[in-house]
Amino acid sequence: MASNYRFAIFLTLFFATAGFSAAALVEEQPLVMKYHNGVLLKGNITVNLVWYGKFTPIQRSVIVDFIHSLNSKDVASSAAVPSVASWWKTTEKYKGGSSTLVVGKQLLLENYPLGKSLKNPYLRALSTKLNGGLRSITVVLTAKDVTVERFCMSRCGTHGSSGSNPRRAANGAAYVWVGNSETQCPGYCAWPFHQPIYGPQTPPLVAPNGDVGVDGMIINLATLLANTVTNPFNNGYYQGPPTAPLEAVSACPGIFGSGSYPGYAGRVLVDKTTGSSYNARGLAGRKYLLPAMWDPQSSTCKTLV
């Protein structure tokens, strides 16, 4: 069974409208996430990309640069301005050491060979197009004019296995799907770069790469890549039932900086020139806003700033 990533803005905003405050969050107990003794994706992992629909070269470069940045040592990192790699380094604290992601093959399907309305089986079929092996993740990215089953209703993306038995590593390679929500549900899948559909209508943050849809995809892609390497076959790290697990990042919804509370992303960095919000620096001068990740050592949701 694929593990869906529900960007938990509705839950977050529910708590906000129910009167939860920042002070209430301080009293939260440590978050416990159990390891279920399954295989994790550690070592060198190839990330293959399937672009379904029309993406501009700039949009593709923002996403590819992000993946390259996850393990790059070429970007300076400090407490004041962290790097994308420093965010990804938290995955090393999970059993098995580091996960080094390397961009592999890319496939452009700009002519919509399966149409513009995709069902769940189509995502798995698309993930097999590049014949990724067991030490790979195939990422399927759908353009803004492509609708996907349950997209914007209960999920912004998903991860799973291409095999018939998703709990067995030998049964198939891992895959991720993320959709561009720009014209369909930016208030659901691209928050905090767009006002939320429900809850307090606080001003949205300015997207660091000037593209609400793609910057929202980065948040969801970051979430799903971290969830995939730490729970690729639904028997790694997660909390709750395996049919609806809370994973490395999805267990920390709506948190991007210190002082966050439901409906407020937290204190993040702001570019003095563009006014855009970010918390991590990547290759090619890119800036990204990345979500909090559960830290196994502290049992808390760790933010970069």
Curated annotation (Swiss-Prot):
The Swiss-Prot or TrEMBL record describes its family as follows: Belongs to the EXORDIUM family.
What this chain does, per the record? May play a role in a brassinosteroid-dependent regulation of growth and development.
Question: Does the keyword section mention Glycoprotein?
Answer: yes
Q: Where in the cell is it found?
A: Secreted; Secreted, Extracellular space; Secreted, Extracellular space, Apoplast
Specify the species. Answer: Arabidopsis thaliana (Mouse-ear cress)
| Regions annotated as coiled coil | none
Q: Tell me the InterPro entries matching this sequence.
A: EXORDIUM-like (IPR006766)
Can you say what this protein is called? Protein EXORDIUM-like 2
Could you provide one GO biological process annotation from this protein's UniProt record? cellular response to hypoxia
Q: Which UniProt keywords apply?
A: Apoplast, Glycoprotein, Secreted, Signal
Give the positions annotated as glycosylation sites.
Answer: N44
The terms describing its cellular component in GO are: apoplast; Golgi apparatus; plant-type cell wall; plasmodesma; plastid
Specify where it is mainly localized: secreted
Q: Where is the signal peptide?
A: 1-23
